[in-house]
């Protein structure tokens, strides 16, 4: 009398189920985007919504903040894009386009999700005003240096004047 344990088909089904159990987690992991991949997808969305003539390409990606492991939770991102020489109507990937000389630079901030199936982002971009911020930092540092130098000069004058005063001997 044959039992089901001795059946070769039961062994095959067990093997198939075991293999499916091993493959399914890999399929789920494959659906999670890296931080940079999620940003690049957001840039594709920015290019699709843009009314500018040319595509934008990633110029600088700020360091990835510490995040939880949930790919469905929106992750904060900030990055800079620069205008390329490729027209927006082209089917080319922005990564294949050269940056336009003196092209417009935009600073972008918002959130992305790493879940490829959701593929959601909420990004807003503004003209990059870091040049003005750098100029402000330059003037602030210059003012600090001038202030320190002025104090040093005043102290030297005081020291000089103290040495000019005749000393009376007691």
Swiss-Prot record:
GO cellular component, one term: extracellular space
Compartment(s): Secreted; Vesicle
Maturation-removed propeptide residues: 31-131
Modification after translation, per record: Proteolytically cleaved by proteinase PRTN3 into antibacterial peptide LL-37. Proteolytically cleaved by cathepsin CTSG and neutrophil elastase ELANE.
Disulphide-bridged cysteine pairs: 86-97, 108-125
Pfam families xref list: CAP18_C, Cathelicidins
A single MF term (Gene Ontology): lipopolysaccharide binding
Keywords of the record: Antibiotic, Antimicrobial, Cleavage on pair of basic residues, Disulfide bond, Immunity, Innate immunity, Secreted, Signal
TM ranges: none
Family the entry assigns: Belongs to the cathelicidin family.
This protein's name: Cathelicidin antimicrobial peptide
Encoding gene, per UniProt annotation: CAMP
């Amino acid at each position: 009398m044959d039992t089901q344990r001795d059946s070769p088909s039961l062994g095959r089904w067990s093997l198939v189920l075991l293999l499916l159990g091993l493959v399914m987690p890999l399929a789920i992991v494959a659906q999670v985007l890296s931080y940079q991949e999620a940003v690049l997808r957001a840039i594709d969305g920015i290019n699709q919504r843009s009314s500018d003539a040319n595509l934008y390409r990633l110029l600088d990606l700020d360091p990835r903040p510490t995040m939880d492991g949930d790919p469905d939770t929106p992750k904060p991102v900030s990055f800079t894009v620069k205008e390329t020489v490729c027209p927006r109507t082209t089917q080319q990937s922005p990564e294949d386009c050269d940056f336009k000389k003196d092209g417009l630079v935009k600073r972008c901030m918002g959130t992305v999700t790493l879940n490829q199936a959701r593929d959601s982002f909420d990004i807003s971009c503004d003209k990059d005003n870091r040049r003005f911020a750098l100029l402000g930092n330059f003037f602030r540092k210059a003012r600090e240096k001038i202030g320190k130098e002025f104090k040093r000069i005043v102290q030297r004058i005081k020291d000089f004047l103290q040495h000019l005063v005749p000393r009376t001997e007691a």
